[in-house]
Design a protein with these regions (language model features):
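Acidic/glycine-enriched connector segments
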Residues: 1-211
Length: 211
């Protein structure tokens, strides 16, 4: 269990959703969930994380939130719109909806009870998820400033944990946008998900690791 210290790292997280099935370009297949979860837990411990800020889509978000809450870290969740709507569009719309739906309900319940659920009013906007990315970064910065005011000196480390394959899908790739926002805000971009890559080689190897 991670110790909860006021001077620990603030981690903002972004990453891939679980793959649709079938998919031509594997990025995050379900058979990697357990391993990625263990690696995220290890990264949070080694970073001395005390707060995780992210969204709650099926895939990296929910895996990280589940791991962080098991470690009794504070988890602040940012959704682009109301949780009930987000659950439909970004959680149970992929394979194994029961698995992801129950995990979503659990982590959202904890965040809501602690006053750490942020539901934006961006439903219907083309940039709803980009807006959520910006708020995730902003919330992490705010928490860092609050911790700094409680301390005599020093600053809390701001880490952007990005769990993805490293290959942009194009201009609408929200993970790539998250990376850019984190860099512009001077977060330490600590980890990348060098995952399933593209094409036949990816289908054959299925290697997903945090590097």
């Amino acid at each position: 269990m991670a110790s909860i210290q006021s001077d620990g790292a603030i981690v903002a997280l972004g990453g891939r959703r679980i793959d649709a099935e079938p998919t031509l370009t594997p990025r995050f297949p379900f058979d990697q969930v357990s391993r990625v979860g263990m690696e995220i837990s290890d990264r949070l411990r080694r970073s001395y994380a005390v707060v995780l800020v992210c969204s709650a889509a099926c895939g990296v978000d929910l895996i990280a939130l589940n791991a962080a809450q098991k470690m009794r870290l504070r988890t602040r969740i940012v959704l682009p719109f109301l949780a009930v709507r987000f659950r439909e569009t970004s959680v149970v719309d992929r394979p194994r909806p029961e698995f992801w739906g129950s995990m979503f309900d659990r982590v959202i319940g904890v965040a809501r009870a602690n006053g750490d659920l942020v539901e934006l009013n961006a439903d219907g906007r083309d940039n709803a998820y980009s807006t959520a990315n910006a708020v995730i970064i902003d919330e992490a910065l705010k928490i860092g400033r609050c911790q700094q005011r409680r301390r005599a000196s020093g600053t809390s480390p701001l880490i952007a944990l990005v769990v993805w394959d490293g290959a942009s899908r194009g201009a609408d790739d929200n993970t790539k946008k998250f990376v850019k926002l984190a860099q512009e805000s001077r977060f330490r971009l600590e980890n990348n998900y060098k995952g399933c890559g593209n094409g036949a080689r990816a289908i054959k190897r299925r290697e997903c690791r945090l590097q």
